[in-house]
Amino acid sequence: MGQTLFDKIWNRHVLTGKEGEPQLLYIDLHLIHEVTSPQAFEGLRIQKRPLRRPDLTFATIDHNVPTEDIFNIRDEIAATQIKTLQNNCAEFDVKLFDNGTDQQGIVHMVGPEMGLTQPGKTIVCGDSHTATHGAFGAIAFGIGTSEVEHVFATQSLWQTKPKNLLIDINGKLPQGVYAKDIILHLINQYGVDFGTGYALEFGGSTMRNLSMDERMTICNMAIEAGAKYGLVQPDETTLEYVKDRPYADLTPEKLEYWKTLYSDEDAQFDCVIELDVTQLEPQVTWGTSPEMGVSFSTPFPAIENINDERAYQYMGLKPGEKAEDIELGYVFLGSCTNARLSDLVEASKFVKGHQVHPNITAIVVPGSRSVKHQAEALGIDKIFKDAGFQWREPGCSMCLGMNPDQVPAGVHCASTSNRNFEGRQGKGARTHLVSPAMAAAAAIEGRFIDVRNWEAVINA
């Protein structure tokens, strides 16, 4: 019987353990940041253990860094975490992409940009959106602080092999519909737990035609579907992205191995979901979970059709209303889901020549310094700033209420991030997950509009 892509990579990395039981996996790449690593480093000190593979461990500063002034860290806890990471990396000889360097950024953007993320690898990080790296045909997953310490000490991790779920996505995306809409639609249709216990392989003609940026957007939100892992078969698009990166180190042996990374024709998946995207609409979440979303033309559901009726109360919305009825106050373009260069370029098309609505505070946070520099070289920053957007420094920013960038209580925010839980963007904040295009257009109009009809709306 053939093997799935996931099984091939998994089996190659098993050090010990029986099928059906926890197995010890070798870890090829460990990415760390300032929030989940301090206790793990301290654990090494207490046990008087060395860091086993500093050469396979890479760090960046992202969660707590201020995006207005990266060196003026007013929050004492944030300042302590950042300084602690800097000291730990120096002590344990870990490469740190530090504040102010050209390589700093959100961890799930730095890995791919530096060529560290590659097909066939096992990749871990103390962050739940590590599945992002699966877009390259890798097994990538988030871990907790105790597991971070285990990888520090052993370069391995005990894991139970999941089942395999194929999401077969086909058809040409309509104009104005994006990768973000695909993953939001899947979560809306099947819920936030349909991927629990599975590794999700995203395949089909649609996936093959997506860029690496778009593939990363989809894999990034596998965790919102309940899955620990999400991955895509590597191909020429993958190779073109990786080949000239600083840490790519493309050897003939590595390239030959990559050619084997696909699911065999006779591979057996435990479950298959099929999606035709030809009629897909822009998606908008209305509630307090990523599954609480609708297509743009669809009214919000009746109370009896949702899992938590308190969501309407928290969000200040009612059944039967539509996305265009929401009174927005903030727009956030950023996060490890949608802060790559192509996201900002696409969003700028809806902004150029227009002004941010008077009721809107609009913020753009490039996901990395590399993206920021590239965007500025193209004049993208000027388009946003001329329109009235704030153009910030790289970081996780308004994706989570951990740093100074927060949405005021009771205010609705169109956000390109990945989670819309209560308080995710600040106490009382009301988050609506959308594509960069939808967020950008909303900043101009002051409300959500159907970006498929952008020209008609803006010229009306």
Curated annotation (Swiss-Prot):
GO molecular function terms listed in the Swiss-Prot or TrEMBL record: 3-isopropylmalate dehydratase activity; 4 iron, 4 sulfur cluster binding; metal ion binding
Known role: Catalyzes the isomerization between 2-isopropylmalate and 3-isopropylmalate, via the formation of 2-isopropylmaleate.
Free-text comment on the cofactor: Binds 1 [4Fe-4S] cluster per subunit.
Keywords: 4Fe-4S, Amino-acid biosynthesis, Branched-chain amino acid biosynthesis, Iron, Iron-sulfur, Leucine biosynthesis, Lyase, Metal-binding
Alphabetical list of CDD domains matching this protein: IPMI
Catalytic activity: (2R,3S)-3-isopropylmalate = (2S)-2-isopropylmalate
Binding site for [4Fe-4S] cluster: 336, 396, 399
Pathway note: Amino-acid biosynthesis; L-leucine biosynthesis; L-leucine from 3-methyl-2-oxobutanoate: step 2/4
Record InterPro entries: 3-IsopropMal_deHydase_lsu (IPR004430), Acnase/IPM_dHydase_lsu_aba_1/3 (IPR015931), Acoase/IPM_deHydtase_lsu_aba (IPR001030), Aconitase_4Fe-4S_BS (IPR018136), Aconitase_4Fe-4S_dom (IPR036008), IPM_dehydratase_rel_enz (IPR050067), IPMI_cat (IPR033941)
Cofactor entry: [4Fe-4S] cluster
Subunit structure and binding partners: Heterodimer of LeuC and LeuD.
UniProt record similarity statement: Belongs to the aconitase/IPM isomerase family. LeuC type 1 subfamily.
Gene3D superfamilies in alphabetical order: Aconitase, domain 3 (3.30.499.10)
BP term (GO), one: L-leucine biosynthetic process
Database matches in Pfam families: Aconitase
Recorded superkingdom: Bacteria
The organism's taxonomic lineage, starting at the top: Bacteria, Bacillati, Bacillota, Bacilli, Bacillales
EC number: 4.2.1.33
The protein, known as: 3-isopropylmalate dehydratase large subunit
